């Protein structure tokens, strides 16, 4: 269980209030698939992922990126019990999809990079530290079923 200060909760809530899901989600997932091409194996049904332009222009990648980013809303709503909030998704990713849990870290790094680029100077070191703590809690919860 993660302990959150009032300031951390306020910071996470503020970040989510400014998220442009339709922009950040597709960019983050595209970046992950381009920078870490082995992650593409989980998206074989998405069609053409042969190069960066194809990935960036792929509607299924964009749609799933938005879905993933909205998946973080669950953690925002249940910050005091993130592990339980993601129990079903952890089971899905480990038992049905067989996703290597190390990929959660790769995607979270890409989300952070895209968010930092979007927010610019507003994404201070303190803001990043809090956001990384949040993503770390989500990644841990998603990986729980693997332990």
From Swiss-Prot:
Gene Ontology molecular function terms on file: haptoglobin binding; heme binding; metal ion binding; organic acid binding; oxygen binding; oxygen carrier activity; peroxidase activity
Cited InterPro entries: Globin, Globin-like_sf, Globin/Proto, Hemoglobin_b, Hemoglobin_oxygen_transport
Metal-binding listed as a keyword: yes
CDD domains linked: Hb-beta-like (cd08925)
Coiled coil regions in record: none
Protein origin, superkingdom: Eukaryota
GO-annotated cellular components: blood microparticle; haptoglobin-hemoglobin complex; hemoglobin complex
UniProt entry tagged with the keyword Metal-binding: yes
Membrane-traversing stretches: none
Ranges where the Globin domain occurs: 3-147
Pfam family, one: Globin
GO biological process, one term: hydrogen peroxide catabolic process
Keywords attached to this entry: Heme, Iron, Metal-binding, Oxygen transport, Transport
Tissue distribution of the protein: Red blood cells.
Residues given in the record as heme b binding sites: 64, 93
Protein role: Involved in oxygen transport from gills to the various peripheral tissues.
Family to which the UniProt record says this protein belongs: Belongs to the globin family.
Subunit structure and binding partners: Heterotetramer of two alpha chains and two beta chains.
Record protein name field: Hemoglobin subunit beta
Organism: Gymnodraco acuticeps
């Amino acid at each position: 269980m993660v302990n959150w200060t009032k300031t951390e909760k306020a910071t996470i809530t503020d970040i989510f209030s400014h998220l442009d899901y339709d922009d950040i989600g597709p960019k983050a997932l595209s970046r992950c698939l381009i920078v870490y091409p082995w992650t593409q194996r989980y998206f074989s049904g998405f069609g053409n992922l042969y190069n960066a332009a194809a990935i960036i222009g792929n509607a299924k990648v964009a749609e799933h990126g938005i879905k993933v980013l909205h998946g973080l809303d669950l953690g925002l709503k249940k910050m005091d019990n993130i592990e339980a909030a993601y129990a079903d998704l952890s089971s899905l990713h480990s038992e049905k999809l067989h996703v290597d849990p190390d990929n959660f870290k790769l995607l979270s790094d890409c989300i952070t990079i895209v968010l930092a680029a979007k927010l610019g100077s507003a994404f201070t070191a303190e803001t990043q530290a809090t956001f990384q703590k949040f993503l770390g809690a989500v990644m841990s919860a998603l990986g729980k079923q693997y332990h």
